[in-house]
Swiss-Prot record:
Highest taxon in the source lineage: Bacteria
Family matches, as Pfam families: Bac_DNA_binding
InterPro entries linked: Hist_DNA-bd, IHF-like_DNA-bd_dom_sf
Name listed for the protein in its UniProt record: Histone-like DNA-binding protein
Length: 95
């Protein structure tokens, strides 16, 4: 299931009784702050999981079209590790 920030804001608005515009601003601010923190350091959301930016080292690869060896450049990737509580909730709901 894919959910948009607008849908999250609409759900908050209906649940809390705030205006949709205020809820959209809150959701945007929360996600922006999470992204800023996650860019710089490991971010752990209690009972949800951890986000961490990791650096991948350069490595050898092969160009599939020419079969020539190439070096795949280093790059950053985002790693998410779910908390044990989130894992338990997911496994509990599938039983």
């Amino acid at each position: 299931m894919t959910i948009t920030k607008a849908k999250i804001a609409a759900m908050l608005s209906s649940k809390l009784g705030f205006s949709n515009n205020l809820c959209e601003e809150i959701v945007h601010t929360v996600f922006s702050n999470i992204l800023e923190i996650a860019k710089e350091q490991k971010l752990t959301l209690k009972n949800f999981g951890s986000f961490e930016v990791k650096q991948k080292n350069p490595r050898p690869g092969i160009n599939f079209h020419t079969k020539a060896p190439v070096i795949i450049e280093s790059k950053k990737h985002l790693r998410f590790v779910p908390s044990s509580k989130l894992k338990a909730l997911i496994n509990e709901s599938t039983r």
